[in-house]
């Protein structure tokens, strides 16, 4: 079965989490050179933080932020921050991105203190609900502003990893997710999007709740792999400069994942990753890629290099590709490959975005920096999307909604 090892490690078939960790002394002074944080925002993001904690990720601080005090209480993290205490009183956002936005703005000074001093920050959240959708773009902006205000020579790299709702979750949630991603793209260097419907295609027998858990596992394993390949001795290391080169200004991104324990396992895993994309795009629409292998102790470097030949062949000679590999004892004979490609186009989710651009025309989806979002603009966007709370009259066409989005530099519905 496809993804047997990943499902097993997620505890879906067998509870084999592989928590053996390398001696912390092996980190040496390297851990002080590059400071990394993973921030989970909202319920989905918090679940990923707990999973990373259980996996024993080394080399990164795990930070949970939420408007829901009860959920936050049960999260396993190194640091926790309750957002918008005076606004939600710890009772959550009620699925309203406007509340999530206000909560993050109200906690701006606390967020700035928490995110200070990091070189690389992963933001993880689910798009389509309240806190993840509304608060995550604010947090991304504060990360960048804090670095500038402190006079740092280089802003931290912000990589956001988000899930996109199942189609069956309804149009309102999907449109909220689109708007959230668009706002997030403004302040993230790269936004990796995992389309939940693709998970169902890849593992069709998964029950819906287990599919959410599987998405958490994919995100957690991806982040863990990148962090530890930077921070720990690996079979083939990826350094921070490699990550920076691929992810800086990368825009929208996809992840593909594959596993194999065949006689040609590394090549087969890469082929599966190139075919099992978590976002509907065509290869060739991106220009940079990061490839990461997680392997058992008996895999040779020759196997990996043969697999990389396939990647170069598929992605093209003009693509900038960085890759690394690390050994995990519990992988056994299995090779897992993850391919992250930046600067991709996905009309289904992202409209007519031009990858790697900093500003966009009126038909694009990202708010130009000169039109920074304000509370009233956020209200207008989400009032237009959600008919239950809209200040606008329900109309037969989308002309009014489209005007709002055009004025802000967003996509048209």
Curated annotation (Swiss-Prot):
SUPFAM superfamilies in UniProt: Tubulin C-terminal domain-like, Tubulin nucleotide-binding domain-like
Places the protein is found: Cytoplasm
GO molecular function, a single term: GTPase activity
Binding site for GTP: 130-132, 169, 173, 216
BP GO terms, sorted: FtsZ-dependent cytokinesis; protein polymerization
A Pfam match: Tubulin
Keyword Nucleotide-binding belongs to the record: yes
Keyword annotations: Cell cycle, Cell division, Cytoplasm, GTP-binding, Nucleotide-binding, Septation
GO cellular-component term (any): cell division site
Its biological purpose: Essential cell division protein that forms a contractile ring structure (Z ring) at the future cell division site. The regulation of the ring assembly controls the timing and the location of cell division. One of the functions of the FtsZ ring is to recruit other cell division proteins to the septum to produce a new cell wall between the dividing cells. Binds GTP and shows GTPase activity.
Oligomeric form and interacting partners: Homodimer. Polymerizes to form a dynamic ring structure in a strictly GTP-dependent manner. Interacts directly with several other division proteins.
NCBIfam families xrefs: ftsZ (TIGR00065)
Family: Belongs to the FtsZ family.
Protein name: Cell division protein FtsZ 2
Organism, scientific name: Pyrococcus abyssi (strain GE5 / Orsay)
Designated gene of the protein: ftsZ2
């Amino acid at each position: 079965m496809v993804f047997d090892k990943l499902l097993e490690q997620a505890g879906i078939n067998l509870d084999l989490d592989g928590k053996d960790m390398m001696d912390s002394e092996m980190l040496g002074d390297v851990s002080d050179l590059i400071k990394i944080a993973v921030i989970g925002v909202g319920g989905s993001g918090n679940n990923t933080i707990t999973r990373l904690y259980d996996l024993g990720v080394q080399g990164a601080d795990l930070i949970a932020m939420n408007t829901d005090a009860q959920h936050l209480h049960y999260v396993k993290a190194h640091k926790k921050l309750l957002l918008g205490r005076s606004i939600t009183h710890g009772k959550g956002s009620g699925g309203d991105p406007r509340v999530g936005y206000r909560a993050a703005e109200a906690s701006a000074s606390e967020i700035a203190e928490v995110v200070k001093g990091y070189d690389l920050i992963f933001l993880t959240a689910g798009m389509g609900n309240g806190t993840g959708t509304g608060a995550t773009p604010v947090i991304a902006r504060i990360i960048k502003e804090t670095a500038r205000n402190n006079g740092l020579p280089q802003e931290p790299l912000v990589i956001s990893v988000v899930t996109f709702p199942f189609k069956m979750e309804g149009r309102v949630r999907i449109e909220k997710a689109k708007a959230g991603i668009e706002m997030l793209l403004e302040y993230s260097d790269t936004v990796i999007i995992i389309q939940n419907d693709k998970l169902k295609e890849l593992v069709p027998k998964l029950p819906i709740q287990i599919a959410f858990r599987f998405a958490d596992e994919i995100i957690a394993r991806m982040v863990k792999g990148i962090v530890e390949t930077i921070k720990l001795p690996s079979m083939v290391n990826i350094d921070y400069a490699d990550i920076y080169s691929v992810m800086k200004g990368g825009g929208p991104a996809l992840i593909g994942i594959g596993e194999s324990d065949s006689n040609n396992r590394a090549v087969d895993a890469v082929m599966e990753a190139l075919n099992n994309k978590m976002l509907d795009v065509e290869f060739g629409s991106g220009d940079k890629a990061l490839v990461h292998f997680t392997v058992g102790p008996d895999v040779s470097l020759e196997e990996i290099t043969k697999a990389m030949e396939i990647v170069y062949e598929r992605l093209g000679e003009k693509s900038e590709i960085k890759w690394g590999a690390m050994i995990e004892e519990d992988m056994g004979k299995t090779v897992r490959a993850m391919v992250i490609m930046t600067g991709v186009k996905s009309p289904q989710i992202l409209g007519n975005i031009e990858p790697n651009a900093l500003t966009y025309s009126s038909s694009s989806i990202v708010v130009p920096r000169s039109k920074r979002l304000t509370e009233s603009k956020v209200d207008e966007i989400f009032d237009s999307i959600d008919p239950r709370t809209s200040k606008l009259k329900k109309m037969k066409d989308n002309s009014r909604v489209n005007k709002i989005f055009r004025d802000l530099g967003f996509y048209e519905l």
